[in-house]
A protein has these predicted regions:
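A glycine-rich beta-to-alpha transition motif near the start of alpha/beta enzyme domains, typified by
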Residues: 1-121, 167-187
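Short glycine-rich anion-binding loops that position phosphate/pyrophosphate groups of nucleotides
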Residues: 12, 132, 164
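Glycine-centered structural positions embedded in regular secondary structure
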Residues: 47, 130, 156-158, 184-185
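Short coil/turn motifs at secondary-structure junctions
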Residues: 75, 132-134
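Flexible, glycine/proline-enriched loop segments at strand-loop-helix junctions
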Residues: 80, 130-132
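Alpha/beta catalytic cores of group-transfer enzymes, especially the acyltransferase/condensing modules
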Residues: 122, 132, 139
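Intrinsically disordered, low-complexity regions enriched in acidic/Ser/Thr/Pro/Gln residues
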Residues: 127-129, 136
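Internal active-site segments that recognize and position negatively charged phosphoryl groups
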Residues: 143-177
Length: 187
């Protein structure tokens, strides 16, 4: 692999390899992303985020050409619409690398649509996540979620905010406290 200038960033215990590629010259592939995210052979991260102007990506076609686009890849090499923690890290990266001012907000492009990020000071950022999309809300649920600490899988409703989530209703806070969330739930 050739030399690659990168920044490592993290937000709420998710870490990312960030690449500044304003002119869209960097070739990313699933294999390269998996290598970069590999914690033994590569840099190690939950994902790769490339900062690129929208005009240089097919996915950026619906945005103003000068819009910064968050080209987000999961650690398995798959493309993702966006990541809530990643978009805040991306904003800090744009302040540092591109000199962007976010105190009045900056609209960025993602595969999940536009997101507006505003710097709050002290390294904190607010993100307008856009509209959510529900799964089969009329049915009340559309998935089953199994998690350590529950004796049986529970019904869940899919909620998409640019990346998928599943919401499970629990009877009490004690029930929540009894879950082992160090292991990903099975959907």
């Amino acid at each position: 692999m050739n030399r690659l200038r990168f920044t490592k960033g993290h937000g709420t215990e998710n870490d990312f390899v960030l690449l500044f590629d304003e002119h869209g010259e960097l070739e990313l592939s699933p294999e390269r992303v998996r290598y970069l995210c590999d914690r033994r052979a590569g840099i190690g991260a939950d994902g790769v985020i490339r900062a690129v102007r929208a005009r240089h990506l097919e996915a950026g076609a619906g945005f103003s050409p000068e819009t910064w686009f968050m080209d987000y890849w999961n650690s398995d090499g798959s493309l993702s619409e966006m990541c809530g923690n990643g978009v805040r890290v991306f904003a800090a990266f744009l302040e540092h690398e591109a000199g962007e001012r976010l105190d009045r907000g900056l609209t960025i492009g993602t595969r999940g649509g536009e997101r507006t990020v505003t710097a709050l000071g002290d390294g904190r950022y607010a993100v307008g996540m856009g509209r959510y999309r529900l799964g089969d809300a009329d049915a009340g649920f559309d998935a089953q979620v199994a998690v350590r600490g529950l004796s049986t899988a529970r019904p869940a409703l899919s909620v998409d905010v640019g990346n998928p989530h599943h919401v499970v209703a629990l009877a009490t806070e004690d029930e929540l406290a009894g879950l082992d969330l160090t292991v990903a739930p099975h959907v």
